Every structure is written in C-alpha cells, then in structure tokens.
Amino acid sequence: MQPSQKNKFGRVDLEVTAFGFGTAPVGNIFREIDEETSDAMFQQSWDHGIRFYDTAPMYGHGLSELRTGHSLRWKDRDEFVLASKVGRVLKPARKQDIDYAPWTNAGRFTMEFDYS
C-alpha cells in the first residue's frame, strides 16, 4: 500500500489518502518539539503524498491546530482533507489555570465541553 493511495471515505463523495498525519505530536504530547521540527514533519508528510490531516482542539490545548494551520496555509485547499473534533471549546486562560498533562508547553487555553 502506498501512503498516497486514495480511498473512498465512508459513504460520502470524499477520498482520503491511505495514510494520514495524526497531529497530536505537534501539539507537544509527552515531549516538546520546536516550530522547525513541526514544520519539517508536515513537509515530510506532504513530500510522501499524505493529504489527510487529523487534529483536535485538545491536542496541546490548541497548539496542534495552530501549527496545522501554519504549515498547510500555503497548500492548495483542494489538495488535502483536514479532520478535527467537536465538543471542546478553547477559552483563553492564565498559565496557572491550565492542567497541561500529558502536553508539554501547550497553548494558553482551557477546554470546556460544548456539544451544542
């Protein structure tokens, strides 16, 4: 199987690459990575044909979504599929109010549940 091979996604008119890039690591899960490393990870995935990116507000308290947007902003939007999650809203927070675990040096947000 090739990472760039496209497969139909469910019963909708959408195709995604066989391999996707799960972005929890760029949200600094378990250990911190710098911006250069994050950018390089996105570029490496792109260079290998990956066009499916999965992120979530909870990954690094918003850091993963920021880095995903930063790295993909110059790519043609019709060339990739971006998935995220619902149910958690990010709100600005003071650093001392945040329980980072298991994230390292995460974004400055707290999470609230909202399934409306």
Residue ranges and their predicted role:
Residues 1-92:
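N-terminal binding-site loop/beta-alpha segment at the start of enzyme catalytic domains
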Residues 93-98:
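Short aromatic-enriched loop/helix-cap "lid" or pocket-rim segments at secondary-structure transitions
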Residues 24-36, 100-116:
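Active-site mouth loops of central-metabolism enzymes
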